[in-house]
Amino acid sequence: MKKIEKLTEKEMANIIGGKYYGNGVTCGKHSCSVDWGKATTCIINNGAMAWATGGHQGNHKC
């Protein structure tokens, strides 16, 4: 179970975040980083699905 706390707008303004693209890639304001374990899993799973379905599946976010 997760503990969730509601933040005020002032508290939200102090949070510096980035964007997670769902495939192991996360980008912030000035740079991006890759979780290679997650990225490798996505590449293998998407490749297998694309092969098994003749290219109709396999481009989903992991």
Swiss-Prot record:
Indicate where this protein is primarily found.
secreted
Per the record, the similarity remark reads: Belongs to the bacteriocin class IIA/YGNGV family.
Protein's name in the database:
Bacteriocin pediocin PA-1
Q: Where in the cell is it found?
A: Secreted
Please report the propeptide residues according to the UniProt annotation: 1-18
User: Which Cys pairs does UniProt list as disulfide-bonded?
Assistant: C27-C32, C42-C62
Q: What gene codes for this chain?
A: pedA
Question: Which keywords label this protein?
Answer: Antibiotic, Antimicrobial, Bacteriocin, Disulfide bond, Plasmid, Secreted
Described by its record, this protein's role is as follows: Bactericidal activity (effective inhibitor of L.monocytogenes).
Q: According to the lineage, what is the superkingdom? A: Bacteria
Which InterPro entries does this one have? Answer: Bacteriocin_IIa, Bacteriocin_IIa_CS, Bacteriocin_IIa_dom_sf, Bacteriocin_signal_seq
Q: Name one Pfam family in it.
A: Bacteriocin_II
Query: What biological-process GO terms show up in the record?
Result: defense response to bacterium; killing of cells of another organism
Q: Where is this region: Hydrophobic?
A: 40-52
The terms describing its cellular component in GO are: extracellular region
